[in-house]
Amino acid sequence: RIVMDRAVEVVSEKIQKKEKFLIPLANPRTLEQLVGFSLLLRDKKDKDSLVALNVINDDNDSLKQELQGKHSLERAAQIMTEADVEPKTVMRFDLNIATGIFHTAKEHDVTDIVIGLHHRKSIVDSFLGTLSENLLKKTCMQVMIARFHIPVTSLQCIIVAVPPKAEFECGFVKWISHLCRMSKHLDCQIHFYAHPQTSGYIRKYIRKKHRDINAVYTDLVSWEDLLILTGQMNYECLLVIVSARRGAISYDSSFEKLPGQISRYFNNNSVVLLFPEQNGEQQ
């Protein structure tokens, strides 16, 4: 336990390094929500921590895409400016959208990616979509895949489902800090559902670094009990599900059920699927 506590302290120190959030914008209808969400996650002291990106597929009607992308980036810049954040926007042409996002992330020293949950075009289409799946394979950084049904500023509570062994991931305290910032900005309660051991580390870190937030803890002994959260959710709550990439310490085969569970039981809720930062080299 002493070794684990020291590991959390080391990662806590690393989070003090410059953060940069990349926001790939593909759908004008979700633009304001994604930028608004990213604004809530950032450290307010950092005035240049957001990068809005539009990747244009060179293989299709690029002129139409370019006009739409330009409009989206202008709107994103406006939202950032209104929040007293230095607007940084990038338009990129690439045959592969995921590759375009990946290279932009490397060029701008990005630490986190915030992306919208794609709209399924057919029943054979995957829940996350090819783009998100490729990003998770190509990068080790934290990726947040978000879907909002109401404006982010209207959220009244944040419910976080945390899998067992999440404390062993190198991105553990990073996502806790991000969600605590969001809770503080919104002045709303954040409720963690986690295994007792994992919950202990969350409590300790929050007491040390974010003692001013309203945090509540409930034991979630088995990840199979995730569906009990359906009784805790309402339209004004955000559900954050902490997942993990294949091969990660906290990865569990039951994560494969998450797409179906979200679609069936949380379809009317605002949801963020969070993949913590991992150790390793970017591809």
What role is predicted for each listed range?
Residues 223, 258-264:
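Intrinsically disordered terminal tails
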Residues 249-251:
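C-terminal structured domain segments
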Residues 262-283:
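Short, flexible loop segments at boundaries between secondary-structure elements
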Residues 13-232, 240-241, 247, 275:
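Structured cytosolic domains appended to multi-pass membrane proteins
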Residues 2-17:
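N-terminal signal-anchor transmembrane helix
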Residues 128-131, 254-259:
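Charged helix-capping and loop-helix junction motifs
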Residues 246-247, 258:
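Membrane-embedded transmembrane helical bundles of large multi-pass transporters/channels
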